[in-house]
A protein has these predicted regions:
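Acidic/histidine-rich, surface-exposed loop or edge segments in extracytoplasmic proteins
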Residues: 2-5, 26-33, 54-58, 162-169
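Amphipathic, heptad-repeat alpha-helical segments
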Residues: 1-45
């Protein structure tokens, strides 16, 4: 279903934020062009741009509070772009709720996923549960990224990692 009308001042601010984030992503990619982890880590930054861009482009802001989520996504994207430009990726060592992304081998698009990393995790192999909970008609990538950065979910086994893939339509 179509989303709600985003007020013009918000739309203008978000559009400007998207331009800044795109420039920051491009600078980071250029600075890290020889980094062997570029292909693995760049989607973790790009997903924030895509989430906001697609929400605006395809009228997928389904509730006005998602405008605030878009501001947060742009801020996190800028933070990650700045870190990655310096060759750092602190989100890869983060505990708790972590938003990541990968580049699809099907179509080359950037796809989000969420992780819940237990505080006790030290890098050794641990149980990992994959929660395939699907998606509703109004769960845009923006809403998913926001949800995965704020909500653990209903299932969190002690000491286990939980992976929340985004249910995409193919």
């Amino acid at each position: 279903p179509p989303g709600v009308a985003v007020p013009e001042p918000d739309k203008a601010r978000l559009t400007e934020g998207l331009k800044k984030l795109r420039a920051a992503i491009d600078e980071a990619a250029k600075a890290q062009a020889k980094n062997p982890l570029l292909a693995d880590l760049l989607p973790d930054v790009e997903i924030y741009h895509k989430a906001v861009d697609w929400a605006l482009r395809y009228n997928e802001v389904h509730k006005l509070p998602e405008v605030k989520s878009a501001d947060g996504a742009l801020a996190e994207g800028m933070k990650r772009a700045a870190a990655f430009k310096e060759g750092k990726a602190p989100w890869t060592q983060q505990k708790g709720l972590v938003v990541r992304a990968y580049r699809s081998k099907i179509d080359g698009s950037v796809q989000p996923y969420g992780l819940v990393i237990p505080e006790s995790y030290v890098g050794a192999p641990v149980r990992t549960d994959i929660w395939c909970h699907g998606r509703g008609e109004t769960l845009s990538e923006l809403a998913f990224v926001d949800q995965r950065s704020k909500q653990v979910g209903n299932v969190q086994p002690k000491g286990a990692i939980v992976l929340h893939p985004y249910g995409r339509y193919c």
